[in-house]
């Protein structure tokens, strides 16, 4: 048994040495910006359209071996929901602004000039601001003419956010083009699925679920330090 352990250690060491001879790690920093399209998955459901908001952040990437690396980001992202009143002349949306911190596995393929990549991993977010936008009084709408309150949940209009820390998982695909050895630009589309509810979800609460989902489209720039 001892011989097998020693042999395994020697084999791993030799493979690592070979890999290091053929590939040197690369560390890059960058920035990105784009748009976030989001909804909140309510149960019972709330009629919605996509809520659009800005997103921007900084990126850190370490390529540790050929075709694989790690990405960490610190992003500002505005999510929320926008209610659908169909033909009624009313509007309501809630802006929820977060600092999002994803840690992603980075898998890429291609040449030195152009690469395609896939990113996936966990993400945590901290709500830093919220804002309600409406063209009616959210505390006194029952007397409004033609307001579609029948068969519609309205408690969320003025309900305070209970959970201001979100966590979930995200995955995205994109492409990167090298300008030269140290500079590159990229585009990415990413999907986020939140696992925490913004409102209470106990039996006594109105909503059994109120988690975020979002689609982010961004363009970014990387500068290679190493």
Question: Which residue stretches match the model-derived regions?
Answer:
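Sec-dependent N-terminal signal peptides
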Residues: 4-13
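C-terminal segment of classical bacterial N-terminal signal peptides
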Residues: 13-19
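Short glycine/proline- and aromatic-enriched beta-strand/turn motifs that initiate or cap beta-hairpins
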Residues: 19-59, 162, 224-226
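Gram-negative (and chloroplast) outer-membrane scaffold detector with strong preference
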Residues: 23, 27, 61-142, 179-181, ...
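Residues that define the transmembrane beta-barrel architecture of outer-membrane proteins
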Residues: 25-27, 48-54, 95-101, 114, ...
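Flexible, solvent-exposed coil segments and beta strand-coil junctions
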Residues: 34-41, 80-87, 146-155, 195-201
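Extracellular loop and loop/strand-boundary signature of outer-membrane beta-barrel proteins
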Residues: 41-47, 86-92, 156-161, 202-207
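Predominantly the C-terminal beta-signal and adjacent terminal strand-loop region
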Residues: 146-148, 166, 171, 177-226
């Amino acid at each position: 048994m001892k011989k097998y352990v020693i042999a395994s250690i020697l084999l791993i060491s030799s493979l690592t040495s070979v890999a290091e001879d053929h590939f040197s790690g690369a560390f890059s920093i960058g920035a990105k910006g784009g748009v976030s399209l989001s909804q909140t998955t309510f149960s019972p459901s709330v009629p919605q359209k996509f809520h659009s908001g800005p997103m921007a952040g900084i990126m850190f990437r370490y390529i540790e071996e050929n075709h694989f690396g790690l990405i960490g980001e610190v992003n500002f992202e505005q999510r929320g929901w926008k209610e659908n009143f169909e033909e009624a002349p009313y509007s309501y949306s809630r802006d929820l602004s977060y600092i999002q911190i994803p840690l992603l596995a980075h898998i890429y393929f291609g040449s030195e000039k152009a690469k395609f990549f896939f990113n996936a991993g966990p993400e945590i977010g901290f709500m830093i601001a919220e804002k309600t936008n409406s063209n009616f009084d959210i505390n006194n709408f029952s007397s409004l003419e033609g307001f579609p309150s029948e068969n519609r949940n309205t408690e969320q209009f003025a309900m305070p956010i209970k959970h201001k820390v979100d966590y979930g998982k995200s995955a995205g695909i994109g492409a990167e083009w090298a300008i030269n050895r140290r500079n590159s630009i990229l585009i990415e589309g990413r999907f986020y699925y939140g696992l925490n509810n913004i409102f209470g979800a106990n039996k006594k609460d109105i909503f059994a679920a109120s988690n975020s989902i979002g689609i982010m489209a961004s363009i970014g720039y990387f500068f290679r330090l190493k």
